């Protein structure tokens, strides 16, 4: 039985992970849960899964959780803060860590799991976007096992040779017969919306993804295709790929989650119903296969599968992310930080949908930054980019 710590248990990925645990109680045991401030949901999770430990992001939330659990007779030990999250990610008796805290806030605990040599199920893409080389160097040094959770990266992982799977981030694609990685994306809810209407898009409209059930931040990223741009950056690091070895293709049905093209002309694709429980179950049980609770794909109901080239006029954030990736780690760190601030401002109805790209571009092009050589330097770049993004938003609102 695998002992599991879930970082970000009350989020979308965290809940899907617990759903897989629920479907396979003989295979997985939850040892620790880590979340932000959603006390009531964390209390429900603790009562159902009886983890030994739980941690909230602040002491006020932790105190509220302790009171709720005490009323129910739970003996789960409750802690708070980043240090606690890092300690629970590195527990000696934990085999597997789901790294699903959204944003750069998830970086310290994800790194703690890596440094402890755990099997890390990576849903926190910001770890690679901001700390790609530093992160992969830690993976190699600690001999941790990295398994991607994003549906696209998990699909690529499943379609690659076992030799690359075992040496993720360091094997040569070319030497293993791989010609190119094909990253698919649905195009989001505004794939056919006239560009003239983009400035009037509301947060609720942006969060209404046609295929996937996701959190609000990642739903907006999908609408701008910034999510695909960040996945492009992540794929470059995860699979040791050059710019020439990755292409992005729009696939509105979200049935093929990504593909790998080989030198002999073959293309291997991973297909399935668009449900995050599938890649989560794959990574949790790897190299075995277990039930995810997802309904099987019915090809007769799916009908046609279509593909198109992304339009950068419609999706300028995608192009911005690809350009930032080619510029270096400082640029992708700044872009990620700016995007977190701009998306939050949009969700709070402080800016227009079209302002997201303007803010992101202004930050990336306006900051003169040297390449980071440590996590501390990455965090400095992150803070600078957030400050500049906030300043740009303030100017837009004046």
From Swiss-Prot:
Catalytic activity: 2-C-methyl-D-erythritol 4-phosphate + NADP(+) = 1-deoxy-D-xylulose 5-phosphate + NADPH + H(+)
Keywords: Isoprene biosynthesis, Manganese, Metal-binding, NADP, Oxidoreductase
The enzyme's E.C. designation: 1.1.1.267
InterPro entries per UniProt: DXP_reductoisomerase, DXP_reductoisomerase_C, DXP_reductoisomerase_N, DXPR_C, DXPR_C_sf, NAD(P)-bd_dom_sf
Positions of Mn(2+) binding: 150, 152, 231
Entry annotated with the keyword Methyltransferase: no
One Pfam family it belongs to: DXP_reductoisom
Known cofactor(s): Mg(2+); Mn(2+)
Sequence positions that bind NADPH: 10-13, 36-38, 124, 126, 215
Functional description taken from the UniProt entry: Catalyzes the NADPH-dependent rearrangement and reduction of 1-deoxy-D-xylulose-5-phosphate (DXP) to 2-C-methyl-D-erythritol 4-phosphate (MEP).
PANTHER family in the record: 1-DEOXY-D-XYLULOSE 5-PHOSPHATE REDUCTOISOMERASE, 1-DEOXY-D-XYLULOSE 5-PHOSPHATE REDUCTOISOMERASE, CHLOROPLASTIC
Subunit composition and interactions: Homodimer.
Record-given protein name: 1-deoxy-D-xylulose 5-phosphate reductoisomerase
Originating species: Yersinia pseudotuberculosis serotype IB (strain PB1/+)
Organism lineage string: Bacteria, Pseudomonadati, Pseudomonadota, Gammaproteobacteria, Enterobacterales
Gene: dxr
């Amino acid at each position: 039985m695998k002992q599991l710590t879930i970082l970000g248990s009350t989020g979308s990925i965290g809940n899907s992970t617990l759903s897989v645990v629920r479907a396979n109680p003989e295979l997985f045991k939850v040892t620790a849960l880590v979340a932000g401030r959603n006390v009531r949901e964390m209390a429900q999770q603790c009562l159902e899964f009886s983890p030994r430990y739980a941690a909230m992001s602040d002491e006020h939330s932790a105190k509220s959780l302790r009171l709720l659990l005490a009323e129910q007779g739970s003996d789960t030990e409750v802690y708070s803060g980043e240090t606690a999250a890092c300690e629970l990610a590195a527990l000696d008796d934990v085999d597997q860590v789901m790294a699903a805290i959204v944003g750069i806030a998830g970086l310290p605990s994800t790194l703690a799991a890596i440094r402890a040599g755990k099997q890390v199920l990576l849903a926190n893409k910001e770890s690679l976007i901001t700390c790609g080389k530093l992160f992969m160097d830690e993976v190699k040094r600690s001999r941790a096992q990295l398994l991607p959770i994003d549906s696209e990266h998990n699909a690529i992982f499943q379609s690659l040779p076992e030799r690359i799977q075992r040496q993720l981030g360091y094997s040569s694609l070319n030497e293993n017969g791989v010609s190119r990685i094909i990253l698919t994306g649905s195009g989001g809810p505004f794939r056919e919306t006239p560009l003239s209407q983009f400035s009037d898009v509301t947060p609720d409209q942006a969060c209404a993804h046609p295929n996937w059930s996701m959190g609000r931040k990642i739903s907006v990223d999908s609408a701008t295709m910034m999510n695909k741009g960040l996945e492009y950056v992540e794929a470059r690091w995860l699979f040791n790929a050059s710019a020439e070895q990755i292409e992005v293709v729009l696939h509105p049905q979200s049935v093929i989650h990504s593909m790998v093209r080989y030198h002999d002309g073959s293309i291997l694709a991973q297909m399935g119903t668009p449900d995050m429980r599938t890649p989560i179950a794959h990574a949790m049980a790897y190299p075995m296969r277990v039930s995810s609770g997802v309904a099987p794909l019915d090809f007769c109901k799916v009908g046609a599968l279509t593909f198109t080239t992304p339009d950068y006029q419609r999706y300028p954030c995608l192009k911005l992310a690809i350009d930032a990736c080619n510029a270096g780690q400082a640029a992708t760190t700044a872009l990620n930080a700016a995007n977190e601030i701009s998306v939050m401002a949009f969700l709070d109805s402080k800016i227009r949908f079209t302002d997201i790209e303007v803010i992101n571009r202004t930050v990336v092009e306006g900051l003169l930054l040297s390449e980071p050589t440590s996590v501390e330097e990455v965090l400095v770049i992150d803070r600078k980019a957030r400050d500049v993004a906030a300043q740009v938003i303030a100017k837009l609102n004046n």
